[in-house]
């Protein structure tokens, strides 16, 4: 403000009047009156400008954009690594399947008939059982069990062994003899009838059977 008063004092009367006209002030009076009017006007307007600047400053502060906070993504668990590990485990398990079981599955996939022996071998390999043919064993053990039961029943009730038990014993002996000499056909039974008759007599004498 001191600089403005100095400048006003330097102005001439005509220049002061022009300043007053420009600001809508009266031009009447001496030079000092014009200077006082201009100073009062400038002081009033200086306060208004200061207030406007303060208001504008507040508005600009309010209008300052706030920093946008980006959402922080949570770290997801490594699912891919787990999937890869499970796939590897599955591959290892499938590689340990026995060859017989794989052949059976392949035959089922392509609708190819699978033999009974291969099925048995696959089942035995699956459960860890040795695949030994049990046809001969089952056929040989059945008559023995039946004979023992018949003998026990006959001894329990004090009865003689029936002709059925004798026939089964003879059949069993014939079968064993055929297996011993490698005879397969049933025609060899005629040549061994004498031996069986002699054995029948000896057995009857031993057990006191009439």
Curated annotation (Swiss-Prot):
The modification N6-acetyllysine is found at residues 10, 142. SUPFAM superfamilies: SAP domain (SSF68906). Belongs to the SAP domain-containing ribonucleoprotein family. Residues 184-193 have a biased composition (Polar residues). Residues 45-87, 162-210 are annotated as: Disordered. GO terms for molecular function: chromatin binding; DNA binding; RNA binding. The lineage of its organism: Eukaryota, Metazoa, Chordata, Craniata, Vertebrata. GO terms for cellular component: cytoplasmic ribonucleoprotein granule; nuclear speck; nucleus; transcription export complex. This is SAP domain-containing ribonucleoprotein. It comes from the Eukaryota. The modification N-acetylalanine is found at residue 2. It is found in: Nucleus; Nucleus speckle. Interacts with DDX39A. Interacts with FUS. Interacts (via the C-terminal domain) with DDX39B; the interaction is direct and facilitates RNA binding of DDX39B. Component of the transcription/export (TREX) complex at least composed of ALYREF/THOC4, DDX39B, SARNP/CIP29, CHTOP and the THO subcomplex; TREX seems to have dynamic structure involving ATP-dependent remodeling; in the complex interacts directly with DDX39B in a ATP-dependent manner which bridges it to ALYREF/THOC4.
